[in-house]
A protein has these predicted regions:
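Small-residue-enriched, tightly packed secondary-structure blocks
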Residues: 1-231
């Protein structure tokens, strides 16, 4: 059975990791993609990971397509510039930052840049009809309404969350960071004792999990309700 893990060498170079579960793509002649997840960053390769920021992935691609696909997508950012651009609001993959298919499983059989020169590497666990993933032209943006709901502060910014200046998040955030630290061999950001979980009306369902090695235990983050787009 082929190795399905993201290479440790790549994870050790990551300045940011976005986890976007159950990205849905329904296509017939035109393919549209949408999903919500989280992004954590670090200042250096030996620094602890920041608290997670909620993000949204959107995009579309022309082509003769038919079928429906749901994928769990992981984006590995290999430069500080890429995560700094994300803090500004959004980036377009392939335009604002170079993106390449990550070397794992079927994704490693073609189009793989083993020198890790791209700014972002994309991974997908796919259960539908499409054999692969192309993210060029997709937009990943900060989900302002979800961050407000999760952190309980109106207008909380990505910069505040990344720098530890936002309110203490629910306990699920710390468990996510513990799994992320295990996957990338770093320490977890020291933070105050987590506050009580947010009411179910604000965070009803699991939304994201860290990208551990195959078969590792995961801890989902609670998903805030998403309001109108504020990009």
């Amino acid at each position: 059975m082929p190795d399905q893990r993201i290479p440790d060498t790549l994870l050790s170079r990551a300045y940011g990791i976005a986890v976007i579960p159950d990205v849905t793509k329904v296509a017939f002649m035109f393919g549209g993609r949408h999903g919500n997840g989280v992004l954590a960053v670090r200042d250096s390769l030996s620094s602890p990971w920041s608290n997670p920021v909620f993000v949204a992935l959107t995009g579309g691609s022309w082509g003769i397509q038919a079928g429906a696909q749901s994928s769990d997508i992981i984006l590995v950012f290999t430069t500080k510039g890429g995560v700094e651009d994300m803090a500004g609001g959004k980036i377009t993959l392939g335009a604002d930052a170079s993106v390449a298919t990550g070397p794992v499983g079927r994704q490693g059989s073609a189009g793989t840049d083993m020198s890790f020169n791209s700014e972002i590497y994309s991974y997908a666990r796919t259960r539908g009809l499409f054999g692969g993933i192309a993210l060029d032209g997709s937009v990943i943006a900060i989900d302002k309404s979800a961050n407000t709901a999760f952190y309980g502060k109106q207008g909380v910014t990505a910069t505040e969350i990344f720098s530890g200046q936002a309110p203490t998040p629910p306990a699920t955030a710390q468990r996510f960071l513990e799994q992320l630290a295990m996957a990338t061999r770093t320490s977890v950001r020291a933070s105050p004792a987590p506050q009580a979980e947010m009411p179910a009306s604000a965070a009803p369902n699991p939304a994201a999990a860290a990208p551990p090695a195959e078969g590792a235990r995961t801890y989902p983050l609670e998903e805030p309700q998403h309001g109108p787009s504020q990009n």
